[in-house]
């Protein structure tokens, strides 16, 4: 299982990457593996404000449909529109081309509450 050390994580298997004043969000390699082949992704709208812990979309695989939760509170400034035609990018590259959305105006307290890669990995055992 791939687990980049430079990202932050949630217990719900989302990852967060700081990116020059904004934050890129996706699901972990563990999560995509549990879901199986992803066939559809429902994304929030650019301009939406999302609240930490709220369902902000869904990820559908051949096995199940899973809600996607906001790991932090912030404003959606971009979504990965490529996922509309190629949702399987989440399976093949969850930490790069399979990113889901980008947020700004993120509350710093939410970021500091996220898990390091080591702490996230311990929770998987």
From Swiss-Prot:
A single BP term in Gene Ontology: glycine decarboxylation via glycine cleavage system
One GO CC term on file: cytosol
N6-lipoyllysine modified-residue sites: 63
Signal sequence coordinates: none
Keyword entries, A-Z: Lipoyl
Annotated cofactor note: Binds 1 lipoyl cofactor covalently.
Pfam families for the chain: GCV_H
Domain of life where this protein originates: Bacteria
Listed cofactors: (R)-lipoate
PROSITE patterns in alphabetical order: BIOTINYL_LIPOYL (PS50968), LIPOYL (PS00189)
Family: Belongs to the GcvH family.
PANTHER family the UniProt entry points to: GLYCINE CLEAVAGE SYSTEM H PROTEIN, GLYCINE CLEAVAGE SYSTEM H PROTEIN-RELATED
Known role: The glycine cleavage system catalyzes the degradation of glycine. The H protein shuttles the methylamine group of glycine from the P protein to the T protein.
The name this protein goes by in its record: Glycine cleavage system H protein
Species, as recorded: Listeria welshimeri serovar 6b (strain ATCC 35897 / DSM 20650 / CCUG 15529 / CIP 8149 / NCTC 11857 / SLCC 5334 / V8)
């Amino acid at each position: 299982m791939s687990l980049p050390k430079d990202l932050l994580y949630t217990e719900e298997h989302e990852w967060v990457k700081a990116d020059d004043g904004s934050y890129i969000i996706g699901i972990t390699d563990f999560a995509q593996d549990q879901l199986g082949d992803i066939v559809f992704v429902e994304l929030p709208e650019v301009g939406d404000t999302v609240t930490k812990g709220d369902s902000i979309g869904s990820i559908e695989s051949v096995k199940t449909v899973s809600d996607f939760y906001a790991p932090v509170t912030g404003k959606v400034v971009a979504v990965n529109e490529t996922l509309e035609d190629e949702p399987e990018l989440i399976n093949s590259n969850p930490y790069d081309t399979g990113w889901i959305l980008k947020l700004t105006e993120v509350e710093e307290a939410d970021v500091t509450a996220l898990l390091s890669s080591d702490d996230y990995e311990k929770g998987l055992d």
